[in-house]
Amino acid sequence: MDSLFDLDQNDHMKFAPLAERMRPKKLSDVVGQELAVGPNSFLAKMIQKDMVPSILLFGPPGCGKTTIATVIANITKSKFVKLNATASGIKEIRDLAKSAKDELQFYQRRTIVFVDEIHRFNKGQQDILLPYVEDGTFILIGATTENPYFEINAPLLSRLRLIRLKALDEESIVEILERALNDRERGLGKHGYHVSRPVLKMVASYASGDSRAALNLLEQATALLEDNGTLTEKELKELAGEKILNYDKNGDYHYDVVSAFIKSMRGSDPDAALHYLARMINSGEKPSFISR
């Protein structure tokens, strides 16, 4: 795998969050998305043949979009490049296209470009991608939490195969948490923490279908324990506070977060206000809406 960031992977993973360390390396290890990436799915068959088409993965936070892209990066013989939608402009896209053409011409090697949060690209940036996807200069894998029919230009959308991922159910998240607890190399297994299934279900409930949020919460909760310690429901409740809210700009979760933000300001709670403000900004909310 080629990356824009050439860091020693082992050193990086020592300090990476639990959610990052526990990312599946094989498609068969992806939990809760059997319809999208199960053994008989279109995508699984194309990945096995190393013939990944341009696709758009869409679904709520923590459902496995980046994980699936990472699995493809681990398996493919193609050059794999991550592009940051918030930090890349038209020049970076054109430079990448030139590099992809050279890779194909001189090394007969395809380039796969992964753009996380592709909805953050404006119309001009999305338009620039179109001819390169169309003529096969590179294969595009986009990921978004937003409704692609509203956030992605129709011409580009028509060139991508849409793969919808669902929010993970409680059992799927519990399975992911159990893996993290038992894994001695990448997870928490060497610490010997004791976390009962009811407590794991509480963690899953707090996370609202977001596996990354669940793993982050588990990591924070167990960090307070001694080795071989037991995480109790009481300790988890004290740490977790309110149930984690999702955020969608045009749906119910959007108004939940906005309401919580307003209430925290009225209640003179700066920490809570900053938390909900950060969530809105991170989710792409327009500053003009927030300022109102």
Where do the PLM segments sit?
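A short, basic N-terminal segment
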Residues: M1-K49
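Walker A/P-loop
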Residues: D2-K14, K45-N84, K98-K101, L130-D135
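Short glycine-rich substrate-engagement loop in P-loop NTPases that contacts/grips substrate
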Residues: A36-S41, S78-I112, N122-K123
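Conserved catalytic/switch belt of AAA+ P-loop NTPases
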Residues: A44-Q48, V115, H119-S158
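A short helix-turn-beta junction within AAA+ P-loop NTPase domains corresponding to the substrate/partner-engaging
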Residues: S78, N153-L168
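Conserved AAA+ ATPase "SRH/arginine-finger" region at the nucleotide-binding site
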Residues: N84-T86, R161-V174
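Conserved AAA+ ATPase "sensor/coupling" helix adjacent to the nucleotide-binding pocket
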Residues: A97, R159, E175-G189
